[in-house]
Amino acid sequence: MRLCVIGAGYVGLVTAACFAEMGNQVRCVERDRERVARLRRGEMPIYEPGLESILRDQLDAARLTFTASLAEGLADAEVVFIAVGTPCGEDGSADLSHVLAVAEQLGAQLRQACIVVNKSTVPVGTAERVEEIIRLGLARRRKRFRVAVASNPEFLKEGSAVDDFRRPDRVIIGSAETQAGETLRQLYAPFLRNHERVLLMGRREAEFSKYAANAFLATKISFMNEMAGLCALTGVDIEDVRRGMGSDKRIGTHFIYAGCGYGGSCFPKDVRALIRSAEQQGYDSQILRAVEARNARQKELLFETLGELFQGRWQGRTVALWGLAFKPGTDDLREAPSLVLLEALLRHGVRVRAHDPVANAGVAARYPEAVACARLTLHDSPYAAVEGADALVLVTEWKQFRQPDFQKIRGSMRTPLLVDGRNLYAPARMAELGFIYQGIGRPRAGHCKASAA
């Protein structure tokens, strides 16, 4: 099919590249001309495993092109995907300005019948608004062809987005027209050869499904973090509790890991938007507000734990951070727990030595003053980051942090304090290696106090 993808951000790039890989002709429209130039050269503006090679292959095969011209992108398109951002507004609601602006442009520039598909995460009723805007635009131009508007929310996980797109758990298509839904089913057919997981439903239901799914996953995380807090007070190890819970098939093993909170571009934004949507309907979303509050509290725990271990003595301290991105497999720093800790440490005059496999540059750009005065140093090696540190804090559970040389680490540190924000390590083993260990919702191992700086 001939496709147009509007927006060369995270969702747009994965969508465009993966559809092109299946033999479709895809034009990706991006208003940032510098980004377009980079993409035409095969340079990725984001980090996502496997995406760069697909993009370059499809560019070479001439199945994928990038343009800053919407008119060029729309020419002969059978299906048009809207994949632009819907950030949080000041009141927490989804900012639809980008989506609605695209709808206005489509009404003004479409030259043939097509299906417009919204992949952006949007509130209930947005497809109807987009459809009406396009209809009015076409009417002003006296165009009589039909444009169907469908909802097709994305369920991509950063760090595994390519695999998620190639092998989706499900494809949700919300459409008011049978033919549009069937066309989209055919478009996705190559990704579903071994299983039929296309769910056809109304547009409003499709829009709500994305919010509900993300809110539920965020709820699981916050629930486990709340249990971890109670475990910490009762001398119980949340990791044993997690295994006990996860063995129940009704609960499962996913998203039940206690830690230092969730971040990223989806969970915080979508929970916030759903809360705001409930408020607009006069509905009290008690659970969602508790989920959000618990997550905000969770992001403060690492700093508080360090304060206890340091006995409130921050002067002269150096803290090493492992992991800065909000999760492994991405360079995304949006609402990352690491930034809450980093900013608290800098406010208290602590020197921070940090390492992340891919997010160092993004952090340096966010904190140029701290980098300039060497209050924050970013290192290419995790071992370099711990040199002379009074504590090591694991914030993001990258695979390369799972089995490091702990003897080398202990020998490099000034004080062998290890705060495990993702419960990656075994407390007893860390104590055997000479560390003072503290996880999330786990009994402390090793000595209980750190010496003064």
Curated annotation (Swiss-Prot):
GO biological process: lipopolysaccharide biosynthetic process; UDP-glucuronate biosynthetic process
Domain of life, source organism: Bacteria
Coiled coil: none
Enzyme Commission code: 1.1.1.22
Residues the record lists as binding substrate: E154, F155, L156, K157, E158, K210, N214, F255, I256, Y257, A258, G259, G263, K327
Catalytic class of the enzyme: oxidoreductase
Database matches in SUPFAM superfamilies: 6-phosphogluconate dehydrogenase C-terminal domain-like (SSF48179), NAD(P)-binding Rossmann-fold domains (SSF51735), UDP-glucose/GDP-mannose dehydrogenase C-terminal domain (SSF52413)
Protein family per UniProt: Belongs to the UDP-glucose/GDP-mannose dehydrogenase family.
UniProt binding sites for NAD(+): 2-19, 121, 158, 269, 334
Name by which UniProt lists this protein: UDP-glucose 6-dehydrogenase
Active-site residue list: C266
Catalysed reactions listed for this entry: UDP-alpha-D-glucose + 2 NAD(+) + H2O = UDP-alpha-D-glucuronate + 2 NADH + 3 H(+)
Pfam families recorded: UDPG_MGDP_dh, UDPG_MGDP_dh_C, UDPG_MGDP_dh_N
Pathway: Nucleotide-sugar biosynthesis; UDP-alpha-D-glucuronate biosynthesis; UDP-alpha-D-glucuronate from UDP-alpha-D-glucose: step 1/1; Bacterial outer membrane biogenesis; lipopolysaccharide biosynthesis
PANTHER family according to UniProt: UDP-GLUCOSE 6-DEHYDROGENASE TUAD (PTHR43750:SF3)
InterPro entries referenced in this protein's UniProt entry, alphabetically: 6-PGluconate_DH-like_C_sf, NAD(P)-bd_dom_sf, UDP-Glc/GDP-Man, UDP-Glc/GDP-Man_DH_C, UDP-Glc/GDP-Man_DH_C_sf, UDP-Glc/GDP-Man_DH_dimer, UDP-Glc/GDP-Man_DH_N, UDPglc_DH_bac
UniProt GO MF annotations: NAD binding; UDP-glucose 6-dehydrogenase activity
UniProt KW keywords: NAD, Oxidoreductase
